[in-house]
Every structure is written in C-alpha cells, then in structure tokens.
Amino acid sequence: MTTLKITPAKLNGSVCVPSSKSMGHREIICAGLSAGTSIVDNISMSDDMEATLRCLTALGIGFQKVPSERSGRTALAINGSGNVRVSQSTVDCGESGSTLRFMIPLGALCGEPLTFTGHGKLVTRPLQAYYDIFDRQGLSYTTASNGYLPLTVNGVLKSGDYELPGNVSSQFISGLLFALPLLAGDSVLKITSALESQSYVD
C-alpha cells in the first residue's frame, strides 16, 4: 500500500481558470457587432462556441484564431463591421441553446430569409417568447410543426416597446439586447415580472 503524506502549507502562484462559456458567447457576439477588429482572449472552445462562430460567419462577421497570452487557451480576432447581413442562407446552431436564442434577433435585422437549424434536443427547445414578438410585429417566420426547428426568419424587427416575462431564459433577453441597439429608433425592453437570471443580464 502506498502512503501519501500531506504537509500543510500556504499556496502561492497563479492559476488560469477556465473562462465562462456564457460570457464567451456574449463577448464574441459583442465584438462581432462592433466596428473594427477586437481581440477576445482566454476563450474555452467547445462545440457550442463553434456554433456561435458559424452563425457570426453567416451574418457576414469574420474571425481568425490568433496567439493567446495564456497557455492552452484560444484567442480570436473578430472583424466586426458594426452591422449584420446574410452571407449564408442557413446556419447550424448545433446543440447550443445560447447560440440559437442569441442569434435569432440578429437574424431578424437582415431583411432576408435566414434559416436556423440544430440537432438533438435543441430542435424542440421552446422559442415562443420570440414567436410572440414576431406575431405582434407582423414579422414573417416559418417553423416545423409545434414551433420546432428549422426556423426561417424573413423580415426586420421594428424599434419600439418590447415585453418579456422575468422568468424567461436570460438568453432571450440577451438576444434582444444585442439586436435592439442596431435598430434605427429607440426601443424599450420591459421585464414584466421579477428577473430570475439577473446576473446574466447585468
């Protein structure tokens, strides 16, 4: 039998902690919506992050991997143009709910048909919060049966008043926060009940 002796001691040094996937999605999207090139470092790459990058590419936003200051991490140079346009008619969101819900409002800025697809359980993830907004605005969209993917959005969101319940996923709120500032007029996003995922929105 091997005996392991542990001697108490004070720790010192530095540790590079894994980055937040939720924040990583948001950071690269914000960089893509900004004018000019932004460097986003310490990204923990995953299938979900790759899905978000695919969607950015479909919206005319370029990127390339660049050397990271942190060993084992990924850094991206995001080439934002300050707006979005459809450069691919179909985007595959993989199994990433964050990607899908963040990108739908951005796709609804383009004024051209854009189809969102996915795999696994993502196909049946609820999107009714967006469908209600589209219905109120008369924005054209089509889905498979029961509101499932694929979803094709064809129209442009209008500036104005928006409402979402506070118990809806913060992904819906973040998606609108990405898109509404890019509209020509002012908009108000009202949360109609207590916000349950405030840390992600803040």
Residue ranges and their predicted role:
Residues 1-202:
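Structural preference for solvent-exposed beta-strand-turn elements
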